């Protein structure tokens, strides 16, 4: 693990990292998030009886869109040409929650960790938004990077 913040320059100011001289490599990142809810709320999602429509389909599209917009949301992120974004949603009724996983890929000069984290986070927020009329105390938690490949820092896996 590095002991330097790459987004802080010598004067202590935030700046966008210069990746001009970095090599183009295959990069991939996976992230996850969970949203916990009442059993009745989860059943409504699973059965497709939610009055707003298919919650999982909407959350999946929102996560994909969010990955593509990460540089608009996080000030020092580079705009990236993503080659793949995948968002999966898994109902876990035994825990009254939904597990969201994301995968982002590209060939580029900088990693896709923030895009994967943003995809999982926004998918969870979309579930909250669609279900808040029936339950306001849902909890989004455990958002984390699961794995990253490529680039100078190499492979990371939890």
From Swiss-Prot:
It catalyses: (8S)-3',8-cyclo-7,8-dihydroguanosine 5'-triphosphate = cyclic pyranopterin phosphate + diphosphate. GO terms for molecular function: cyclic pyranopterin monophosphate synthase activity; GTP 3',8'-cyclase activity. Keywords: Lyase, Molybdenum cofactor biosynthesis. Its EC number is 4.6.1.17. The active site is at residue 129. Substrate binds at residues 76-78, 114-115. GO terms for biological process: Mo-molybdopterin cofactor biosynthetic process. Gene3D superfamilies: Molybdopterin cofactor biosynthesis C (MoaC) domain (3.30.70.640). Pfam families: MoaC. Pathway: Cofactor biosynthesis; molybdopterin biosynthesis. Belongs to the MoaC family. NCBIfam families: moaC, PRK09364.1. Catalyzes the conversion of (8S)-3',8-cyclo-7,8-dihydroguanosine 5'-triphosphate to cyclic pyranopterin monophosphate (cPMP). Homohexamer; trimer of dimers. HAMAP family: MoaC_B. This is Cyclic pyranopterin monophosphate synthase. It comes from Shewanella sediminis (strain HAW-EB3).
